[in-house]
């Protein structure tokens, strides 16, 4: 359903995955302010790209395979204040990698598919958006390694299990995790999501630390209200904050 933010509007009626707290959290958390060229992998309705456009002066390239989602995405781009900085390409990231200039993006954002060989969704569109069948972690990391500049960063959000699986594959792609945030939906509950900040390995990779800083974030307090930390992150976007 259509969703209005403070500076832009999202129509996601044709998109397999609607606007979600995961997407808003990632778009608000990713360190984008100094970025010049941003890549949004699996753009969906364009939420992350639009948040990135609001938070930076970067040129943003959005990749979306599904034609219906791409229609929503392009419409949302056209109606935004930043349409001249937003470019949508309707293709897979695998196809994009065959023609794109290597190491040309200083930030990559992605809210990846996160069901791996699990039960398929009732909606075919939703299934494509949520399953790793169309984009495995190996393919995602291959793309990040190929397209990210040497000093660049990639920001992702995944369920805990998926995040741990992805972290185990970083080394083989010459990538490393600089920071992770464990996200709990409600105070007192176990974290169920993880934000990851990934960078290329330095030349002295063998001497790099194998651990990374981990912090915690709670979305809602026990009384059901948004936490102060979440409000601080998202207040530039949500109308009622």
Swiss-Prot record:
User: What is this enzyme's catalytic activity, as reactions?
Assistant: adenosine(37) in tRNA1(Val) + S-adenosyl-L-methionine = N(6)-methyladenosine(37) in tRNA1(Val) + S-adenosyl-L-homocysteine + H(+)
PROSITE patterns, A to Z: N6_MTASE
Pfam assignment, any one: MTS
Any single GO BP term: tRNA processing
Return the similarity comment: Belongs to the methyltransferase superfamily. tRNA (adenine-N(6)-)-methyltransferase family.
Q: Enumerate the UniProt keywords alphabetically.
A: Cytoplasm, Methyltransferase, S-adenosyl-L-methionine, Transferase, tRNA processing
Q: Which domain of life is it from?
A: Bacteria
Which EC number(s) does the record attach to this protein? 2.1.1.223
Job description of the protein: Specifically methylates the adenine in position 37 of tRNA(1)(Val) (anticodon cmo5UAC).
CDD domains in the record: AdoMet_MTases
Localization annotation: Cytoplasm
Name recorded for this polypeptide: tRNA1(Val) (adenine(37)-N6)-methyltransferase
**Cellular component, GO annotation:** cytoplasm
Is Transmembrane helix there in the keyword field? no
């Amino acid at each position: 359903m259509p969703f209005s933010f403070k500076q832009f509007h999202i129509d996601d009626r044709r998109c397999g995955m609607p606007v979600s707290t995961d997407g808003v959290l990632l778009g608000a958390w990713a360190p984008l302010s100094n970025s010049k060229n941003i890549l949004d992998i699996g753009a969906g309705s364009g939420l992350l790209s639009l948040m990135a456009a609001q938070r930076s002066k970067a040129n943003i390239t959005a990749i979306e395979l599904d034609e219906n989602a791409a229609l929503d995405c392009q419409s949302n781009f056209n109606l935004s204040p930043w349409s001249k900085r937003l470019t949508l390409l309707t293709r897979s990231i695998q196809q994009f990698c065959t023609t794109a200039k290597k190491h040309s993006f200083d930030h990559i954002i992605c809210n990846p598919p996160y069901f791996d060989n699990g039960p398929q969704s009732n909606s075919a569109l939703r299934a494509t958006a949520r399953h790793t069948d169309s984009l495995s972690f190996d393919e995602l990391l291959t793309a990040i390694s190929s397209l990210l500049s040497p000093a660049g960063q990639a920001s992702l959000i995944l369920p805990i299990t998926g995040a741990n699986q992805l972290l185990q594959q970083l080394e083989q792609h010459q990538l490393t995790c600089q920071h992770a945030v464990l996200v709990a939906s409600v105070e007192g509950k176990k974290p169920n999501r993880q934000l990851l900040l990934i960078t290329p390995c330095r030349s002295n990779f063998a001497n790099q630390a194998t651990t990374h800083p981990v912090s915690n974030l709670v979305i809602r307090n026990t009384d059901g209200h948004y936490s102060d930390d979440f409000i601080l992150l998202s207040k530039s976007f949500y109308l009622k904050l």
